[in-house]
């Protein structure tokens, strides 16, 4: 009788061990907290505090890979392949960029806080194909432990009329936080969006 009980207990332990191993070998589902599939830019004219919100739906998210973007303004007004942000010459604007996970429309997660918490591992870079706009970190921006601005909040100063293509990147683990082009920063790309800035 005791031998039988001992055998059953041993068999049960083996079964539980095998089940545990199977669970460990099963790949974990993608963590929803790592998904960044929507970017929002709020543009505020510093002279009168008027603002406009621009939404960019990112179709795919994959470190270091190209992915498609569907740009939309607040009124779903699309201009060709790019969203157009209208700016006045000789003016100053505040650009606030945020990153969301809207996989579940009923539970939209603001991922910007996670980016801030990992500020040493992230950097926002705007690459402009043209002249007429100067960009700098602005009040309310996040500064990393080395004194580098994250560029979540920036001031755009316009000068002359221009139509400028803009690419905005959220860079993960950049090797440098200074540069003029995306390649200067190294690391991988968490998010990439495109729009046109029209200065008139």
Q: Which residues does each PLM region occupy?
A:
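Intrinsic disorder/low-structure terminal segments
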Residues: 1, 6, 53-55
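Bacterial Sec-dependent N-terminal signal peptides
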Residues: 2-4, 14-41
């Amino acid at each position: 009788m005791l031998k039988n009980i001992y055998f059953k207990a041993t068999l049960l332990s083996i079964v539980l061990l095998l089940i545990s191993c199977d669970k460990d070998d099963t790949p974990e589902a993608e963590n929803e907290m790592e998904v960044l599939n929507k970017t929002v830019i709020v543009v505020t004219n510093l002279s009168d505090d008027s603002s406009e919100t621009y939404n960019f739906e990112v179709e795919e998210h994959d470190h270091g890979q190209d992915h498609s973007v569907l740009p939309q303004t607040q009124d779903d007004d699309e201009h060709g392949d790019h969203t157009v942000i209208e700016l006045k010459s000789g003016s100053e604007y505040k650009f606030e960029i945020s990153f969301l996970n809207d996989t579940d429309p009923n539970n939209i997660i603001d991922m910007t806080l996670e980016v801030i918490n990992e500020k040493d591992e992230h950097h926002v870079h705007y690459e402009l194909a043209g002249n007429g706009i100067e960009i700098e970190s602005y009040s309310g921006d996040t500064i990393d432990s080395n004194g580098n601005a994250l560029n979540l909040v920036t001031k755009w100063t316009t000068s002359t009329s221009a139509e400028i293509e803009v690419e905005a990147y959220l860079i993960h683990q950049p090797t440098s936080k200074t540069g003029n082009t995306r390649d200067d920063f190294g690391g991988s790309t968490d998010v990439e969006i495109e729009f046109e800035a029209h200065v008139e």
